[in-house]
Design a protein with these regions (language model features):
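GH16 jelly-roll
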Residues: 19-291
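Sec-dependent N-terminal signal peptides
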Residues: 4-14
């Protein structure tokens, strides 16, 4: 009887643990004011005030107010050390959308090692990691990295796809275990679409683009809005297995940080410490939970 009571107590504690976070309502953060409404700032790196501002005039679109991130050359390498915003409350199954422009570093420092992350992230002590991401390495803004991380610490699992959207080339669609695990190609329903319509002259640093993902319990879809036609172009429609699809709530985020390990597909030398405070502009971010 004592063992049964202990088991019941354990499962109740798991349920309580899973329900402790407050879930966000539907929102759009326009970054039109210096004060954030649905996010908080959270960098673990230097405390330099210049690293972020909200409600500043865009240098790309003078009529727009934006969130401005500047990478600090004094920051050490590592995710979270650069500027980052984190949603005040948890987010869950729903549609996530953002409009942003990454910096162009190619004429100044072509081997810059810096990452833009548009993503969800929460490491739960019981259920492990819940991460869905879009990422760009600023040394080549024609390439998009999308995917998820799930699993407990030391047992992380990745599903991912790497795309050159200017040419429409899909470099890989894979599953791997751990950061340095062997990648295994995904096929069938986990590898759709098998071809992608190129966006002529796609360059994430040349203008603002709108990106998004739809997070379902059994499906994940990443997409971009074509800047001319307004058509939604699906970058990856992952289904056919629940493996790799986060099942617990997360925090909604945007960040900009230095990497000294992750080089480009076509340039592994692009891991240099940023020499200047390169700028990321974010026009808006939205979240619409499924009913």
């Amino acid at each position: 009887m004592k063992q049964i009571l202990l088991l019941i107590s354990f499962f109740i504690s798991l349920t309580i643990h899973a329900q402790t976070g407050k879930l966000s309502h539907s929102f759009i953060e326009n970054f039109s004011d210096s004060v954030l409404e649905n996010f908080r700032y959270g960098s673990t790196g230097t405390k330099a005030a210049f690293k972020w501002q909200s409600g500043v005039t865009s240098k790309t679109e003078p009529g727009s107010k934006v969130l401005l991130f500047k990478i600090d050359p004094m920051d050490s390498a590592g995710a979270g050390r650069g500027p980052e915003i984190i949603s005040n409350n948890f987010t869950y199954f729903g549609t996530y959308t953002a409009r942003l422009k990454v910096p162009d570093v190619r004429t100044v420092q072509p081997n810059t090692g810096a990452v833009i992350g548009y993503f969800t992230y929460f490491m739960d002590s019981v259920y492990g990691l819940s991460e869905i991401d879009f990422e760009w390495l600023v040394a080549d803004p024609s390439i998009i990295y999308i995917g998820t991380w799930t699993g407990n610490r030391g047992q992380l699992k990745r599903i991912g796809r790497t795309i050159n959207l200017d040419s429409g080339i899909i470099y890989n669609t894979i599953y791997k275990e751990g950061y340095k695990g062997e990648p295994f190609p995904l096929t069938g329903a986990q590898n759709q679409p098998e071809t992608i319509e190129a966006i002529d002259n796609y360059d994430a640093s040349s203008k603002f683009y709108t990106y998004g993902f739809d997070w379902y319990p059994d499906r994940l879809t990443w997409w971009i809005i074509h800047p001319v036609t307004g058509k939604k172009i699906v970058l990856w429609d992952y289904q056919g297995s629940q493996r790799g699809i986060p099942q617990h709530q997360s925090y909604y985020r945007m960040n900009f940080w230095h990497t000294n390990e992750w080089g480009l597909e076509n340039n592994p030398n692009a891991i240099e410490k940023p020499l200047h405070p390169y700028e990321l502009e974010v026009d808006w971010m939205s979240y619409d939970p499924f009913k």
